[in-house]
Amino acid sequence: VHFSSSVMVLLFGLPFLVTLVCYGLMALRLCRPLPGAGQSSSRLRSLRTIAVVMTVFAVCLVPFHITRTIYYLARLLKADCQILNIVNVVYKVTRPLASANSCLDPLLYLFTGDKYRHQLQRLCRVSAPQRRITA
């Protein structure tokens, strides 16, 4: 359990805290009003992107680390096999979710950025086969 707790703090807690602080500072900066200007739509989109990225980070990684800690705790307390099997299955389900976080971030930035989203839409239109309508 000590090893699992250390791993959770070093490999999840610390990066999550650093990410949370950095994105939080960015969000605070974006929320500050500029003299003579209202809240621009680009600032709101940036705030939305920050919220989405942090939510996906938490949804992908929190279940994995909690489940892994519960698994090691159950092993330490010599829980019966049925409990260990249930926790092990949940762990195996959450592990790919944790790995998926690395793949999801670039996609999130791709789909939340106007420039890239418009280029992707244009690419999809160009690559889609054109239908000819005949009378």
Curated annotation (Swiss-Prot):
Role noted for this protein: Receptor for ATP and UTP coupled to G-proteins that activate a phosphatidylinositol-calcium second messenger system. Not activated by UDP.
Major location category of this protein: membrane
PROSITE patterns named in the record: G_PROTEIN_RECEP_F1_2
Disulfide bond annotation, renumbered to this chain: none
Transmembrane segments: 1-25, 50-72, 91-112
Superkingdom to which the source organism belongs: Eukaryota
Any GO BP annotation: transepithelial chloride transport
UniProt topological domain (Cytoplasmic) ranges: 26-49, 113-135
The UniProt record lists the keyword Zinc: no
Tissue distribution: Expressed in brain, heart, stria vascularis and vestibular labyrinth.
A Pfam family of this chain: 7tm_1
Topological region Extracellular: 73-90
Keywords assigned by UniProt, alphabetized: Cell membrane, G-protein coupled receptor, Membrane, Receptor, Transducer, Transmembrane, Transmembrane helix
GO cellular component: plasma membrane
Membrane topology: Multi-pass membrane protein
GO molecular function annotation: G protein-coupled purinergic nucleotide receptor activity; G protein-coupled UTP receptor activity
Location in or out of the cell: Cell membrane
Family: Belongs to the G-protein coupled receptor 1 family.
Organism: Meriones unguiculatus (Mongolian jird)
Keyword Membrane belongs to the record: yes
Protein name, as recorded: P2Y purinoceptor 4
